[in-house]
Amino acid sequence: VLVPGGFGSRGSEGKIMSAKWARENKIPYLGVCFGFQLATVEFARNVLGLKDANSSELDPDGNNSVIDILPEQEGVKNMGATMRLGDHEVMISGGKAEELYGSSAVYERHRHRYEVNPEYISQIEEKGMNYTGRDESGRRMEILELEDHPYFMASQFHPEFKSRPDKPSPLHLGLVKAALE
C-alpha cells in the first residue's frame, strides 16, 4: 500500500482506513508526506484510543490534533510559499530506515505545512510507532516505523523527488522488496 502526499479532506478517511488495514494485516505500507501524517492519525485513533485524533488541517477545532501546523506557519493567511520546502538533513537512528539508506544522515526534499505534534510523540512511541528519522534539531519527526511489522514505513519528506531510474528511493525500493516477500 502506498499512500502519497496531498492536501485537504477529500479521501482522507479512506487513506486512514488503508493505513489501518495495512497495519492490522501486516501488509507492506509506505506513506509519503500526507500518508505519513494520516498513518500517525490512524495509530493515535486506533492504538492510543484517541477516537477524535486528527490533523488540524482537517479539523482545525479538534481536541487531539496529533498533526499540527508548523509553528512558523501559524497565523499565515497568504498560502503562497508558506511551506517547509527544499532539501533538509534527516538524522536516522536505527530501524529499517537506517538499513535501507545505509547511513545515519541523509538529505531529502520536503514540501509540507504540517507536522507531528510534539505533545503526542512519547505516547505514540510508547505504543510501538517509532520515529526513527528526525530533523537535525531532533524536534521534527521525519520517518516512522512500526515495531513488529514486516514493512510499515512513512516519511514526512518526499523520497520520490530524488528517486531516479538508476537509483530508486530506498523507501520505495524497500516497499517493493517487502511486497515480493
Walk through the language-model features, giving the residues of each.
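Short coil/loop linkers at secondary-structure junctions
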Residues: 50-51, 103-104, 130
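Glycine-rich phosphate/pyrophosphate-binding loop
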Residues: 73-110, 117-119, 125
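Acyltransferase
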Residues: 106-181
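Cysteine-nucleophile active-site neighborhood
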Residues: 2-88, 95-96, 165, 171-180
